[in-house]
Amino acid sequence: MALPWVPQPASAAPATSSKAKPATATSKAKPASATKPAKKDSAAAPSAGPATAGTGQALKLGQFEDWIAYSTPGARKICYALSVPKERLPKNLNRDPGYLFVSYRPDEKVRGEIAVVMGFAVKEDAPAQAVLGSTTFQLAGKDSSLFVHNAAEEGTMLAAMKKSASLVIKASSKRGNATTDRYSLAGIAQALDQAEKACK
């Protein structure tokens, strides 16, 4: 499933703070050693702009700690909240930026769809998981993205995300590399509230 509304990396990343800095979209993971070349997985890069085709640039609704809410103009309105990983492992794996999205698409009757852009082609037949404390949700891979395997669990997962401090995404690349991305959930409740209101 494509994510045509993926924002431009430079404008999408939440601002860094004096605490742990989220990965900026213009930087790539650096090799662990200067003498050891980084491995690179083939990846489908995020689309050039933050809106669907023909709708123009997305409007930033607000930044809430580590999350940003956006909406797109045009007839087919899309609203979403996003964040970038605080930590990506293994550090020596060179890949494109990653994002965690929650989207609202009224024309498609979609509300609160969770999606993760991994920054590399995922191994679609391998297990992928979203871990919130002691609770684990199974994910399904498609191209370079992950979605909740059982869509009926999205509401439960969103409720858990609003109450948790962080979310860990575990997945394997098409080349077989096991990866772990950690996202901060600080500000997600407010960002989701803004995105949902904008797409009522």
Regions found by a protein language model. Name each.
Residues W5-K200:
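A generic "folded-domain core" signal
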